[in-house]
Curated annotation (Swiss-Prot):
Highest taxon of source: Bacteria
Gene3D superfamilies membership: 3.30.1370.30, 3.30.1490.10
Entry annotated with the keyword Nucleotide-binding: no
Entries under NCBIfam families matching the protein: PRK00136.1
Protein's gene: rpsH
Annotated protein name in UniProt: Small ribosomal subunit protein uS8
GO BP term (any one): translation
HAMAP family named in the record: Ribosomal_uS8_B (MF_01302_B)
InterPro entries linked: Ribosomal_uS8, Ribosomal_uS8_CS, Ribosomal_uS8_sf
Keywords: Ribonucleoprotein, Ribosomal protein, RNA-binding, rRNA-binding
Subunit details: Part of the 30S ribosomal subunit. Contacts proteins S5 and S12.
Family, per entry: Belongs to the universal ribosomal protein uS8 family.
Length: 130
């Protein structure tokens, strides 16, 4: 059976792994997933990630905890295959008054809402992180 929404699967795997206190989580890799993992790493929500070149490419995400609790409190999918969510540069969402981030897929690559505003581009709002 094929996977309908690979990014939602990635976010769910991260949420579930953090819920049970795992140090790492492994999933099938794709360019979009690697880009999202890079944004999460750059923003300090995960410790890092790696892509293995085994028979099938796998993405391993190293989860981050603070005082025994997950750093990521909320990880929600916004745009999904059945209902895409696009926002112009002036309509990009702020998450929790700027405390969280929205990950946006733009013509200049996958970036945070703040970086997209600074670059003056809009795009598809993939997910929000707090």
């Amino acid at each position: 059976m094929s996977m309908q929404d690979p990014l939602a699967d990635m976010l769910t795997r991260i949420r579930n792994a953090q819920g049970v206190g795992k140090a790492t989580v492994t999933m099938p890799s794709s360019k979009l997933k690697v880009s999202v993992a890079k944004v999460l790493s750059d923003e300090g929500y995960i410790n890092g990630f790696s892509v293995s070149e085994s028979p099938k490419q796998e993405l391993t995400v190293e989860l981050k905890y603070f005082e025994g609790k997950p750093v990521i409190a909320e990880l929600d999918r916004v745009s999904r295959p059945g209902l895409r969510n696009y926002a112009g540069k002036s309509a990009l969402p702020t998450v929790r008054g700027g405390l969280g981030i929205a990950i946006v897929s733009t013509s200049k690559g996958v970036m945070t809402d703040r970086a997209a505003r600074a670059a003056g581009v809009g795009g598809e709002v993939l997910c929000t992180v707090f």
